[in-house]
Amino acid sequence: MGPEPAGATVRPTFAKSALIRSKIEGIDYAVNPYYGCLHGCRYCYAAWMTRRRFPDHVWGLHVHPKVNVHRLLDRELSSARPGLLGIGTSTDPYQSIESRFQLTRRCLEVISHHPGFDVSLLTKSPLVLRDLEVLRAIDAEVGFSVSGLGDAVRLLEPRAPPGEARLAALRRLSSEGLRTFAFISPVLPGVTDRQIRTLLRAVAEARPSKVLVDALRFRPGVLQSMRSALSSSPDLLRELGSYASDQAWWLQRARAEMEEAAAGLGLSLEFLF
């Protein structure tokens, strides 16, 4: 949640629009206050989307704050048909530089003046707690994505806050009465499947309103990026190769193990694969 990592390039920019029609089922509009994300997660599907706009950028080391996004949002919501706003569909709205630019907060404040729009926000950062009161005021739903706990996941999430910190923040928001969800995504071979019971127990203790689970999907460049990140870990490379060679079998096995563990915890899981 602190300053941007060494070597990062932050270049403020002016966006042309704030609302984007979403292709995600159930979400009408996407709102992303930043181009790029400093978390640098090596499995992120948004990396290739950012590279299309900025071909020379290194994923995780370049970010463009959309410094006018809140003003655009105010204007566009005035004429948009009411619907669900998904905040953070291709960036983390609470990545470290949000503490400096406060663009996500400003967007939330704008939304509070436009009744009729629901909000579902996804993050990996406890910085979201800063905005608890405005999130409560607009009855926002807040989700945290988490694929694993401890050091096992760090090679693939080099600058994201630890999973334990995310779940602690999730528990705080749940205890404050906000609608919350845990998003176990992506299910990572050699990581998520090796700590299913531990992870699901920690998720259950955070008391989310719901728990979603999604698969690792190989968007353009993702497999290559993951292989590079895991080059120092032969075991994880082998697990990744096993998944890549037979995703259907691997996911069927992982789902069965997760369902069994969740049943023992009284936890209901909603699978998106």
Kindly give the residue locations of the regions a language model identified:
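Hydrophobic faces of well-ordered beta-strands that scaffold small-molecule active sites
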Residues: 29, 85, 119-121, 142-144, ...
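Short, electropositive alpha-helical surface patch
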Residues: 101-102, 136-147, 192-209
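Surface-exposed amphipathic alpha-helices with a cationic face
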Residues: 112, 136, 170-175, 259, ...
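Conserved Radical SAM active-site core
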Residues: 1-141, 149-151, 167
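Conserved strand-turn element in the central/C-terminal portion of the radical SAM core barrel
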Residues: 159, 172-192
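Conserved radical SAM core fold
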Residues: 51, 86-95, 126-129, 141-160, ...
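Auxiliary Fe-S-binding modules of radical SAM enzymes
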Residues: 1-14, 20-21, 194-273
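Active-site glycine- and acidic-residue-rich loops that bind
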Residues: 120-121, 187-197
